[in-house]
Amino acid sequence: KKSNVNIGFSFSKEKNRIRIPVPKQIFGKIEIESELGDITLGAVQTDSLSVFTETGSVTVRETQTKKMDIKPELGSVKITRSTGDIIIDNEMGNVEVAADSLDHNFNINNEMGSIHISTKKEPSDLFISASSEMGSIRIFDKKTGAFRAGDQTKEMELKTEMGNITVEHSN
């Protein structure tokens, strides 16, 4: 049985920190909204993860999900060792994704900030499309805006108006 949990908080002082331990189970949906403050999520299993923040960085690590939808207005995004389709719509801040493999769909749109994707495994079934109005693009050490491997059933679309885009192998 999948669970949904709703928890609301409101603070008027600065530098408040909330830590919410959750039981080890698979959640149907996790939604996190914040006006101000950094959000860190780790070691969670959920079908759907949705994170919105007006001002603050978002960090997601070791999270298994079918779909991850992250929308910060002002702040960086860092995703490490997590699985599932990723949608990021960021107005200002860098985006960094470190994955073991690129076997999910990615749609990352960044108005102002760089996008950096690193993977340990060579992609075998992926199409990458990257565009930057003001910045450089490097995909696996080549100055190109496109990459194709295998049947291309998985897609990665990377866009930034102002910033560099890098997709590379990591150690």
PLM features per residue range, with description:
Residues K1-K67, S76-T83, E96, T144-N171:
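Right-handed parallel beta-helix
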